[in-house]
Amino acid sequence: MSDDYDPTAVAFKPGDMETDMNTGEPLALEAEAAAKDPAHNEESGEDTNANVESGTLVHQGDEPESIDKEDKVEDGPDTKSDGGVLDEPKDGEQRDDEKKEEHKPENPSEEVAEDDDYVPAAVSEPVEEDSAGGGSVGGTGIPDGAISSLAASTTIPPPSDPNQVGGGASSTSNNNNSGPDNNKRKRLATDTIGILEDRIAANPRDMPAWLDLISTIVRKEKLDESRDIYERFLALYPLSAEIWIEYITLEMDNGEFKRLEQLFGRCLTRLPNLKLWNIYLTYVRRVNVLSSESDKITEARTNIIKAFEFYLDHVGIDRESGNVWFEYLDFIKSKPATTTWEEQQKNDLTRKIYRKAIGIPLNNLSILWTAYTNFEYSLNKATARKFINEKSGSCQNARQCQTVLENLMRGLDRSSVPKSGPRDEFQVRAWKKWIDWEKSNPLGTDNKAETNKRLLYCLKQAVMSLQFVPEIWFLAAEYCFDDPLLKTEALQFLKDGLSLNPNSSLLAFRLAEYYEREADAEKMRTIYDEHIESLGKERQALIEAQGDPEAEPTAEIIKLNTQISIAYSVCMKAVKRFEGIKPGRMVFKKARNTGFATYHIYVASALMEFHHNKNPTVATNVFELGLKYCGSNAAYVQHYLDFLISLHDDTNARALFEKTIPLLGPSDAASLIKSMIKFESDFGEITSVVKLQDRLRQLNPDTSPITIIADRFATSDFDVIRQCDMLQKPKSRTDEDSDSERPSKRARRTSHGNDQGDKMEPFNLPQKIDALLRQLPNSSDYGEATFDPQRLVDLFRDVRIPDGLL
């Protein structure tokens, strides 16, 4: 393909539209957008920490010594414990030099994010101008020479409403029908658009509401409003190929070819969607007329050939693209050759296309192979066998891969509109299987670039289909991190995934860890702050949905409290590693001041202090501070108890036990007593063991004596009493830890929605039938199952066996 080809510049010349020399944007479109929204470039500030720090759990004076007396922590000798019973921490004390320091909390909204506008990996690179005129536009893979509007389309333009910029779940749609005041009034039943806008404002991930709103507005046949709703949706979910197709079709139906080319430039190279690319190819062939009356037939044919090459280079590896390979071959063959040289050139190009196609696992590979052999024999029978033998091996391998790929993709949902609601575990497993298969290099090629190309194609398909599944984004990034050549793509997967899933701790922690390894403290802190801010917004929304601020928190709110506290804990440890103990303590202080910190932040801070200089005093003070607010939490008490035992501080361990037991419920108290029985049995007195066993039986009279004694003498890997005296089988650790184990039949029946088999009793097959089945090849020989196992089970269950076979 020549370097001066622009697949979207096939209908108009660069002079057809005036553009801004700085931005490359069409001036007419910029003026139109500015007329619609005069406030488009206004910025609004917001305190991003306000929603997280809305309440206070402790006063500023309630500081542990880890913050109040930092010099003592680092010096060590001044903070030695006297070894006596625990004292209450001295709250309110603060060094003079500490008071002079003024802590300025971070405000992520004041920092310039790396990617203000969400742009997927394929077009995230800036437009580079080559003084020589060569190169490509914006790193999109579209060669230079495009119309000026395309050069400015490598990023998604901001929507008409500035409040919609930023993407992700935290963005909400705002227009005349969905303002905060209008949401409070009751909508009329006929106000369909207003009702849908309210649903979207309440939940930006309400995909049925989005699709209904788009359909309703487009049916009004008002072009500007239709464009606005498409831009709003695609600003939030730019990987939705089906919506891009609708948008492009709208512009095509209205003859807006210049806008159409801009849309192609924004989405084509980043979305490996065959239907979208087919529309592009149809458009190119539509505007390049191959008429004998045309004086530009040679130029038109060249444009179409380059468009075919562009298409096949990006999505030609898709198994469903076989028809386009045939279309390209037919187009090449249709050109009349006037000289022997032209005929030879046409045959060489045709052979090149055939030989490239038959090495790809396409759905019509057998037909392609037959056509190729006929083509070679029609040219020269003497050389045909040589050419055919050279490619027969790769074609046979591609056929086998095509069979496996067909089984892998059976039942796979490749639509790219985000799916709201619970995740589909079947789809997640199916995509993982395809990704793993592509990573294994099934074609056996030595070309690393081709292997990476197929893997990236599969990964992009997966994240398009499962946009709200952070696990898939994470796996895509990790697969790319394994190859140094794909480091840029890996980082982009993390950024794009976190943009769509801002509440994902998996993606936030992994991306922050990446920046920590790159020694970029600012970006690392920004990731943590924005993640905590997003979680805080969701928590605040749930509290407001409750209606009563004094009501008991729901399970979802409690879960968010824990998630936010753990996020603070992870951030605190990272900051301590990168910047030192004092900045880490400030993160701990910020977490406590949220008003809903769970015990996790206290445990993390205490252990961080202890491992900083191995002095237990500050750590003990932090544990004691947490005891004021988490003393009725058995898990926290257990952590504190384990810490004291690790210090060989038996006196304070027993004191803590007696102090907290009255605060716990029966179940939690029993768990703590069992832990203390184990401790006394290992390191204490037998009289203490007997007393604790009596307390346990008083608390829970149904407790079996043999259970108590079995727990005392069990080790981490062997339960001597249960396994030797009671003959109980040990619990297999492989059943818990293995991710590759074969799921049970019951689990498979449940995953397919069939529970009828749960009541079936196992039965033995007749000997002759069993012998026949044993002669069949092992299922692993096929790579993937070629039949539905549930239907096979149903067949065995319902089959009538003739008496002669029994």
Swiss-Prot record:
Keywords: Cytoplasm, mRNA processing, Nucleus, Repeat
Biased composition (Acidic residues): 108-118
Gene Ontology molecular function: mRNA binding
Cited Gene3D superfamilies: 1.25.40.1040
Keyword Cytoplasm: yes
Localization, UniProt: Nucleus; Cytoplasm
GO cellular component: cytoplasm; nucleus
UniProt cross-references to Pfam families, sorted A to Z: Suf
Biased composition (Low complexity): 170-181
Ranges of biased composition (kind: Basic and acidic residues): 33-43, 60-107, 732-744
Name of the protein this chain belongs to: mRNA 3'-end-processing protein RNA14
Species in which this protein is naturally found: Yarrowia lipolytica (strain CLIB 122 / E 150)
